[in-house]
Design a protein with these regions (language model features):
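Flexible, glycine-rich active-site loops centered on histidine and acidic residues
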Residues: 2-9, 70-104
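Solvent-exposed, flexible loop/coil residues
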Residues: 43, 67, 106
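Structural motif corresponding to the early beta-alpha repeats
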Residues: 61-73
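N-terminal beta1-alpha1-beta2 module of alpha/beta enzyme domains
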Residues: 1-62
Length: 106
């Protein structure tokens, strides 16, 4: 059975990276973060550092929003991370609690 951790990408990014390293050392296989262009730091930049600092952990967003992220950029980003670090990324896709949902009252 695999286990994962979920962290917010709160500053400093170095703290998130260190916590993911400790999680891998403790036996966790997955490192997830939230993706918000408003609330936290940019997760995809941090994923590159997490992947560099770990040896086997799979990382990615719990949910990335197709309304706020361009799909061609996301596809290129994941292809590049997988090329650099092996097939160690995963992506949840959905609208989550996005500003569009909040503003539209849905």
């Amino acid at each position: 059975m695999d286990f994962g951790v979920v962290l917010q990408t709160n500053p400093p990014a170095s703290g998130v990276i260190a916590m993911m390293q400790r999680a891998e050392e403790a036996g966790f296989s997955y490192g997830w973060t939230w993706d918000s262009h408003v609330l936290w730091q940019e997760p995809f930049v941090i994923y590159s550092r997490i992947l560099s600092a770990t040896s086997a952990m799979t990382v990615g967003p719990m949910v990335t929003n197709p309304g706020t992220r361009d799909w061609s950029v996301i596809a290129s980003l994941f292809a590049t991370l997988n090329d650099m670090y092996g097939n160690r990324t995963v992506c949840g896709i959905g609208r989550a609690s996005c500003r569009e949902r909040v503003y539209s009252g849905v």
